[in-house]
Amino acid sequence: HQNEKALADHEATFDERFVHWSQSAETGTSWEAMDIRSVSASNDTKLVLQRDSVIQAEGKLGKTEYVVLGKAGGEALRAIRLEALIHDTLPKNGPGRADDGNFVLTEIEVRWAPDSDPDAWKKIKLHKPQADFSQQNFPVKNAIDGNKSGNNGWAVSPQLGQYHSALFELNEPIVSDESYQIEIKLTQHYQGNKYALGRFRLSITSDEGEIDLGIPLTIDSILALSADERSDEQQQSLKTFFEGRDKQLLQLKKALEVAKKPRPEDPQVTKLKARLELVSQPLP
């Protein structure tokens, strides 16, 4: 009962904490959706650019490379964020195309070229990778280690059917007075052949100092509205997102689950039951 009470007490303050958070949300690094000019994929996979810079993968499953070409310029570009998004058209809601909703990002590569010399591509080194979650043996640092073999990369099992994000800082920021093209290549060569991203979005930041994953662009745009401008659906999206970030709530739920698990029966009791059953059987 102690665990149930702790959970109930915590849930009772949910509305108060939620309102406080939604009014003064510390959103961290400010991310901006990439201005995308074209998307393509190898191996008969089709990438479809949707609104809000969301990219959805369709068509044939297989080892593939996604190439996203965008435009940038003005402020220095310091980091790139990849959001892995869920959707009901994907197996188990995704965010990957594998049967269980997983994906394996083998490698992410970035290069850029100034508009005045569009063939003068310069490769950019990435470092300081971060992710909200990494599968055991598939840490996010694998996505920038240069190894494109079939069992290496960033993946997110068992946290499937959930939003995930990763960021990669540029070794040296791109600083250009004129606008330029930026190309991001996502290689997905996992040996299972199905482990590609199903739905994703790329964002960039020019923030200086410590860079963090920030919050999803969709949540960011809802937070920009005042409470009475938000639809019920938008308000619910905020609540779901806030719940997912409530570490204490997750810990309390876990403690309650553990407490509710039936305890294994004492072997002596099991033996006694078996003997009683024998004794109580009618004689022939």
Feature roles, as predicted:
Residues 1-284:
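Low-complexity, glycine/serine/threonine/alanine-rich intrinsically disordered linker
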